[in-house]
Amino acid sequence: RLSFDGQAYQVSVPDLATASDWTGALMFLKTLLVLLDVSVCEHDGVDYDKDSILDFHFTDIFLSALSELTKEVKVHPIVEIMGVKRPIYINELYLGQIIHVPDDQLLNSYDQRLRFTQQLNAYYSEQQVFKIEQNGEDIIIPINYLNSEGRTILPSQPELEPQYLQEYRGSKVAVARLFIMTADGEKLAELPYREFLESLTEGIYMLDAKYVLVDPISPEMLQKLSQK
């Protein structure tokens, strides 16, 4: 994040930023020092110029923040951290997959996993909610859509999304549904959400603590699902 208070520019990098993000920020800062023809910026009492700014040691900052995150996921089921394009949700299982590597591979493991969540070319399935009335009672039906022809990001649990919880408080929630669609909007199949996810033995990957990535659905798989 770049800010200017009228006297000085400030470049802020989250403590849990990836090594790639840190490197990019330091390269940008070096360019800024050159363009503004200034020679010194200060961090914790240490001076850096355009020739030494790339030597800034961010590793200690990152490792300290990662240690705090490790403690936090033991207290909270899911911890949300900031991403470039979308938030990243972390729990003990997901964090364990990242950090249980040799020490010299930790930065790269963290970098690759988090960048993958941000740079992924996939359809992000946003939940829609439909309300019907049955016997004088409001019933809420959560629905997600899966693109049969491309990779799709889906919530890992068939739950009502937080933005709908207050709006439909007190309403009965029906079994969440999944519509399998073509890229042109044709519905190919409709399935119970949880049943679909549990039926996948391949082509499904943990994206983070709240979302999974599902590969395109083959005609054979689609036929099998349609027969259920």
What does each model-identified segment do?
Residues 1-23:
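Short, intrinsically disordered low-complexity segments
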Residues 2, 50-56, 191-192:
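Short amphipathic beta-strand/extended segments with alternating polar/hydrophobic composition
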Residues 34, 71-75, 227:
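Generic surface-pattern signal
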Residues 54-179:
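Aromatic/basic-lined ligand-recognition segments
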Residues 163-228:
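Extended, charged low-complexity segments
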